[in-house]
Amino acid sequence: MTLNLRVLSPNRVIWDSEVQEIIISTNSGQMGVLPNHVSLVTAVDIGVMKIRLNGKWSTMALMGGFAKIDKDRITILVNNAERDVDIDLQKAQETFRRAKACLVQAEGKRQVIEADVALKRARTLLEAINASPSDSN
């Protein structure tokens, strides 16, 4: 049995095909979805989504949004997302370094929050391609 997974951003369709299983980051933790899952709507946190297709796992960096699950259909609406195969390691590492520097230099609550979110997004890109953020010092 399979699931129909669609991942949509405001600009494009990022994924639209059958999968065997997914694991997504929600605001309350990781959630696995298999065929015949109970119907629900949930917020999707910034994090890595794992996708099992033909017995192999791939990943996608999700930048927050919402997921609607209805038995064998999953629609995920995201602010942005990148498939692991589309992420440039050097660009992701540079983004991570810049985000860390911005967090260190942030002044005031708003700047700290914005810098922290930027760092979380940058870390998610690296995690999606299995690169350790600590390798990006």
UniProtKB/Swiss-Prot annotation:
Keywords: ATP synthesis, CF(1), Chloroplast, Hydrogen ion transport, Ion transport, Membrane, Plastid, Thylakoid, Transport. InterPro entries: ATP_synth_F1_dsu/esu, ATP_synth_F1_dsu/esu_N, ATP_synth_F1_esu_C, ATPsynth_dsu/esu_N. It is found in: Plastid, Chloroplast thylakoid membrane. GO terms for molecular function: ATP binding; proton-transporting ATP synthase activity, rotational mechanism. SUPFAM superfamilies: Epsilon subunit of F1F0-ATP synthase N-terminal domain. The keyword DNA damage does not apply. One of its GO terms (cellular component) is proton-transporting ATP synthase complex. It holds the Pfam family ATP-synt_DE_N. It comes from the Eukaryota. It is a peripheral membrane protein. HAMAP family: ATP_synth_epsil_bac. Belongs to the ATPase epsilon chain family. F-type ATPases have 2 components, CF(1) - the catalytic core - and CF(0) - the membrane proton channel. CF(1) has five subunits: alpha(3), beta(3), gamma(1), delta(1), epsilon(1). CF(0) has three main subunits: a, b and c. Produces ATP from ADP in the presence of a proton gradient across the membrane. This is ATP synthase epsilon chain, chloroplastic. It comes from Pinus koraiensis. The lineage of its organism: Eukaryota, Viridiplantae, Streptophyta, Embryophyta, Tracheophyta.
